[in-house]
Amino acid sequence: MKLALIGIGQAGGKVVDALVDYERRTKTGFVVDAIAVNSARADLRGLRTAPESRQVLVGLTRVKGHGVGADNELGAEVIAEDVGEVLSMIDDLPVHEIDAFLVVAGLGGGTGSGGAPVIARELKHIYTEPVYGLGILPARDEGGIYTLNAARSFQTFVREVDNLIVFDNDAWRKTGESLEAGYGSLNAELARRLGVLFSAGEGDGSGAVAESVVDASEIINTLGSGGVSTIGYAAVELDRPKRGLLSRLSGGKAEADDGGDSTNRITSLVRRAALGRLTLPCEISGAERGLVVVAGPSDVLSRRGIERARTWLEDETGTMEIRGGDYPIDSNFVAAVVLLSGVYDVPRVKELQAVAIETQRDMLAKRESSAASLDDLVSTGDDRIEPLF
């Protein structure tokens, strides 16, 4: 699937960095172009893969290149005011080569959470290609204002895109990691999952041909349910001489390849992917649509295993709209990616909304209390001191 990536804000830019880095290392060619949009000049300078010619600094007259300070209403305003600059850069893209746009943003900050829905709305108004969102939820300990930002952005973003893929930082952060290392590893994990999913079917024709091809139409149909999506992933290393692009499929445990266990291996991987750590933890029963992609050497991609895994996922989700296919690549790993679209039983989102409501109430009460306290401070009580004007 050919994508145009648009990273909004600091987190969005760094995730796009990770996706482009993955695509370049694996030479899979699913990224047609990538653009970074931010209100903070320093954040744009920190990007590795987006050259200055593919960067847009917005809000220069309002915030002078210093960012919006986690104010997502201001973030939405500065993006809306300068959206013409963003669209002008997008106009330069070879849109005829693009299957979809992917707008990426952290939902807890200011520029990304406020601006991503604005960009998505404009893209849907102008282009016929699907516009998908990738939203990153803040961790619980990042603070109430970021939770409130995320809750407000979430309900707006999901309305403006054709489908919103969600990644929950809180479910993936490891204890003891530094902030920079933690987010770096999370971005790499997310890029691996999305990379395997979107690069399926994008080979140059020189390798093995998939028996059941997963192309752009399969992904578009799966995401066609709208709403919210989550992605699962599992990988296992084959016990044989290493070869090929090992970095593409990593993180699995070593396992012997006896030639007759391919079916069981694939069904086990798909179960682990669907029932393990999803990008957004949720109850998978009730998902509207699903897609299974199994990647690895062609000689271990059992068609029977993929069909059994697909049938199992139909039973678990309760929907017959489960697509599946293989993705032959030269690797020493076998990996399964499960995309679940239209999920709705998501406790984390309900928790996020509850905390956001409480934060909003506290902020309003504090604002009213502060105004009254200031009046008490400046008042002399008997009104004998006159103000200057």
Curated annotation (Swiss-Prot):
InterPro entries: CetZ, CetZ_C, FtsZ/CetZ, Tubulin/FtsZ-like_C, Tubulin/FtsZ_GTPase_sf, Tubulin_CS, Tubulin_FtsZ_GTPase. GO terms for biological process: cell division; microtubule-based process; regulation of cell shape. This is Tubulin-like protein CetZ3. Pfam families: CetZ_C, Tubulin. The gene is cetZ3. Keywords: Cell shape, Cytoplasm, GTP-binding, Nucleotide-binding. Disruption phenotype: Does not affect motility. No differences in growth rate or cell size. GTP binds at Q10, A11, G12, G13, K14, G110, T111, G112, E142, N169, N187. Involved in cell shape control. Signal peptide: none annotated. The keyword GTP-binding applies. GO terms for molecular function: GTP binding; GTPase activity. Coiled coil: none annotated. It is found in: Cytoplasm. GO terms for cellular component: cell division site; cytoplasm; microtubule. The lineage of its organism: Archaea, Methanobacteriati, Methanobacteriota, Stenosarchaea group, Halobacteria. Belongs to the CetZ family. Gene3D superfamilies: Tubulin/FtsZ, C-terminal domain (3.30.1330.20), Tubulin/FtsZ, GTPase domain (3.40.50.1440).
